[in-house]
């Protein structure tokens, strides 16, 4: 009479390995891409000249980080405010549209005044599946209007992009 060895240990081990593989895959390809952006480790760099006070700039950074949380599966590495760069970019945007074009930023400058619009630069890292991507220098524009119902930390979101 022949006896056969039990295949139960191999089956149990196979099921355990498959379960772990499924859990790792779900974490990496389902959970990570769907979670709000991690803003907890963002480096904040401020180079201000007095246009906005410290609490206004802090409010702009908080509003920006809150908005960037919608970048699911990403990490915000840095938020920068440089008053000179902000003024230069805002003036250039307004000058370009002066000859008949339009943009949300130029419209905000007309509506709120050049002295009430701010530009923040962001570095963002994202992971899509097995690929990493980086958005360095992603811009966010806000208008200071603390009385508005749309304002977050006193700032109204205007636009974002390069």
Label the model's feature ranges.
Residues 2, 8-15, 22-134:
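Flexible low-complexity loop/turn motifs enriched in small/helix-breaking residues
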